[in-house]
Amino acid sequence: MTQYTLKQASVLLQSKQISAVELASAYLAAIAEKNPALNGYITIDQDKTLAEARAADERIAQGNASALTGVPVAYKDIFCQTGWRSACASKMLDNFISPYTATVVQNLLDEGMVTLGRTNMDEFAMGSTNENSFYGAAKNPWNPEHVPGGSSGGSAAVVAARLAPAALGSDTGGSIRQPASHCGITGIKPTYGTVSRFGMVAYASSFDQAGPMAQTAEDCAILLNAITGFDPKDSTSLEREKEDYTRDLNQPLKGVKIGLPKEYFGEGNSADVLTALQNTIDLLKAQGAELIEVSLPQTKLSIPAYYVLASAEAGTNLSRYDGVRYGHRAAQFADLEEMYGKTRAEGFGSEVKRRIMIGTYVLSHGYYDAYYLKAQKLRRLVADDFQTAFARCDLILAPTAPTAAPKIGADASPVETYLSDIYTIAVNLAGLPALTLPAGFSGGGLPVGVQLVGNYFAEAKILGAAHQIQLNSDWHGKRPE
């Protein structure tokens, strides 16, 4: 019962072939069996889950259900939810029970979706491997010696392991797309401002965006329909008419122009990644898509620009964790200043501290112009590159990561880890939508994904292209043993 896609589960629930309680119980049993080794979930509450499932069954019986009523979903630990611990995988918030619910979570609760639990992540979403979690690293379900990716690694792992039909993640520099690639699932980062950030704990506010993670592009489209929309509680939320993101799922690819950025197909990629790209190119050609070379010359500037800007925003956002009103507080201190210092020293992990220090440095007097202001200018150049490319093509095909998932504990420096985000970060700098879908396997049997990038508000076009690829391939249907 836990093998269903979100769409399949929806059909079975609406036709009353299964009940929401039966489905939730099956997932809870699978979680109890497999999660201790996977560590994908960090918070489970069976009583809350089953109460939501019973309410969903009542709603279905009364005939006022939505297509998502009764379908289980997992939430990355970055989303606040009333009555649930919302820790952001940090010691700083280990004891924080949220008094309110994030808009995206509330949207899915209003649809009648059933909360399975809260998934592991890199602390405060800062990381690419899920090793920065206070609760220990989540494992890759294809090989537990390897990382699931980050920062939404737990969400990717539980969907891949069939411990949830779908999950919500967040993407600041690739945190939906990179773990989706490493775990062999589909995940989409929408256009910045399309999905409300209210109740999603802030890392870098001008980058953060929530999005769905599931087995298929069709599932992601269905979830995206439910979570998008203007929210007056989020000042960056865009006022636009609601879209149907499933509208292009059956659109053929004939004549669609796909750009191949020459800077993304170089020697920095592993042979496995190049094979996955070629697999996708062959599928696109077979369906009549037109492939053209484009250039994104500022790609090499995206990493330094991102880590200056995101760290600056993180340093500001994380100043709220001081031990005064909520979260961890040091047990012993002589005065207020010492309490602040000890609380933050004890509560934050090493990667979070590193980014706070980088952010404080680049915003400091004498360095603001040299780093922060220059990075903002580079951000515009990166965005302009994409607009030049989209004048010639409809979508861009690119790698998601230069390699398959690395091993847990791989001796990589912070800079090497940052460089693994080279293909995802530029999309966040520009605020564009992008989707990762499975496109093959490494020689070691690990999934490898590719990403489709679109212009602003082209989510339906991206999802349609991904769906057509998945109708003609079966990588998304593979699952770990």
Swiss-Prot record:
Reaction(s) the record says it catalyses: L-glutamyl-tRNA(Gln) + L-glutamine + ATP + H2O = L-glutaminyl-tRNA(Gln) + L-glutamate + ADP + phosphate + H(+)
SUPFAM superfamilies attached to this UniProt entry: Amidase signature (AS) enzymes
Statement: the UniProt record of this protein carries the keyword Nucleotide-binding: yes
Domain of life, per lineage: Bacteria
EC nos: 6.3.5.7
Molecular function, one GO term: ATP binding
GO cellular component entries: glutamyl-tRNA(Gln) amidotransferase complex
InterPro entries noted in UniProt: Amidase (IPR000120), Amidase_CS (IPR020556), Amidase_dom (IPR023631), AS_sf (IPR036928), GatA (IPR004412)
Residue numbers annotated as active site: 76, 151, 175
GO term, biological process aspect, one: translation
Protein name (record): Glutamyl-tRNA(Gln) amidotransferase subunit A
